[in-house]
Amino acid sequence: MKKMMIATLAAASVLLAVANQAXAGATLDAVQKKGFVQCGISDGLPGFSYADADGKFSGIDVDICRGVAAAVFGDDTKVKYTPLTAKERFTALQSGEVDLLSRNTTWTSSRDAGMGMAFTGVTYYDGIGFLTHDKAGLKSAKELDGATVCIQAGTDTELNVADYFKANNMKYTPVTFDRSDESAKALESGRCDTLASDQSQLYALRIKLSNPAEWIVLPEVISKEPLGPVVRRGDDEWFSIVRWTLFAMLNAEEMGINSQNVDEKAANPATPDMAHLLGKEGDYGKDLKLDNKWAYNIIKQVGNYSEIFERNVGSESPLKIKRGQNNLWNNGGIQYAPPVR
């Protein structure tokens, strides 16, 4: 009996190992076979993923998708986008409808450990705040006792707002909507006293209101909201490719490499780490099953982290959000990437 149990356990272990091997690399193989990355994004958030009048998508989350395509194919245009609501996003990833979720999604323990998904990094450090009309005369979120609060359903915001009001002995009435645009319209129409969401999303929604200057973001940040790309758990190869796409952008900024000077830097790398990153020394692309110019292609076609931040949400964008904690570690922020070596 004991021998039979051992044999059964051994057989199960072999089957599990085979299954894991089958899953490893499956996404990259499928992506290369179909010729593009299918990327899940938001259903319309300026600065992160937003379509213009011609249907062209732009934003930080979109640029991560483009970066992955540049790494895999050497062509950042080989990506297709699937706009998803907060309720739809995880099912779309779990079912295989999308290869990657790059959709202003907060990294939490339950999502990372309990839903069969893995977060590859943090593209934007954020926190939940409140948007309200300046005529209300509010100076602090602690003045919101009794307020009606617009919230997007299926987001981390619902729980965080409940916790904040409870901790401060305040009452509120939540009004939920499936889409962020719907919650913004409800706020503008007077249905809600305030709108709660990630602060970056509040700035993005504010510019879509009729008179943006009349609306203010209250100073309190009531939670930690690290936003980043998500992949299915179990495919370490694909996980690494998506993770190192962001790391390449961060390393490039730290080394002073951007889309305009990358050819000059590649021709004469100043340090061994720069030579490794740009594919001039070593065989580091092999570890990712990619060409050694994978990072060069990301930087050349999409840019470094500073470039994607500033053009989408920073000084070159209508949002004018300051880098803050999204600065590099050596410039007062907490963004940091391991070296390519």
UniProtKB/Swiss-Prot annotation:
What UniProt keywords apply to this chain's record, in alphabetical order?
Amino-acid transport, Periplasm, Signal, Transport
One of its GO biological process terms is:
amino acid transport
Q: Pfam families attached here?
A: SBP_bac_3 (PF00497)
> Which subcellular locations apply to this protein?
Periplasm
Span of the signal peptide: 1-19
Q: Which InterPro entries match?
A: Bact_solute-bind_prot3, SBP_3_CS, Solute-binding_3/MltF_N
- What SUPFAM superfamilies does the record point to? Periplasmic binding protein-like II
Q: What is its main location?
A: periplasm
Mind telling me which GO cellular component terms the entry cites?
Answer: ATP-binding cassette (ABC) transporter complex, substrate-binding subunit-containing; membrane; outer membrane-bounded periplasmic space
Give the similarity note: Belongs to the bacterial solute-binding protein 3 family.
Q: What does this protein do?
A: Probably part of the binding-protein-dependent transport system YdhWXYZ for an amino acid.
Protein name per UniProt: Putative amino-acid ABC transporter-binding protein YhdW
Biological classification of the source: Bacteria, Pseudomonadati, Pseudomonadota, Gammaproteobacteria, Enterobacterales
